[in-house]
């Protein structure tokens, strides 16, 4: 499996989005412990002088990017190619930005169901499904009109 989980949290560690594609989803306590550990690991890093890739466990590495006050994190297999996932984090944020018109944390909080809809269009079962921003926005506008 490629993507094991996708997280989004703010500088204070408040989780705004979480989607598990592996065994963490079945154990809430294990999920909470993993999120706390990920937050401590990422928030303590010097983002100007350290890379966006961190080894997390024996089988998982974290790929993250900070946008304003939000961290977007993907947990991927240890042997996967980091830049590809970093580009997909950026694509996800670009699609959010285009869909909401200059997205902010409050958009994610109050429209979380739309954000999960966007995530579902991009990732299915931990695999990347769509890489075209235009195609994603076209599909999302159709789905949004159904609302």
From Swiss-Prot:
UniProt subcellular location: Cell membrane; Membrane, Coated pit
Keywords tagged on the record: Cell membrane, Coated pit, Endocytosis, Membrane, Protein transport, Transport
Recorded superkingdom: Eukaryota
One GO cellular component term: intracellular membrane-bounded organelle
Gene Ontology terms: biological process: endocytosis; intracellular protein transport; vesicle-mediated transport
Keyword check for Metal-binding: no
InterPro entries for this protein: AP_complex_ssu (IPR016635), AP_mu_sigma_su (IPR022775), Clathrin_sm-chain_CS (IPR000804), Longin-like_dom_sf (IPR011012)
Primary location recorded for the protein, binned into one broad class: membrane
Membrane topology category: Peripheral membrane protein
Stated family: Belongs to the adaptor complexes small subunit family.
Misc note: Present with 1390 molecules/cell in log phase SD medium.
Function comment: Component of the adaptor complexes which link clathrin to receptors in coated vesicles. Clathrin-associated protein complexes are believed to interact with the cytoplasmic tails of membrane proteins, leading to their selection and concentration.
SUBUNIT field: Adaptor protein complex 2 (AP-2) is a heterotetramer composed of two large adaptins (alpha-type subunit APL3 and beta-type subunit APL1), a medium chain (mu-type subunit APM4) and a small adaptin (sigma-type subunit APS2). Interacts with APL1.
PANTHER family: ADAPTOR COMPLEXES SMALL SUBUNIT FAMILY
Protein name, as recorded: AP-2 complex subunit sigma
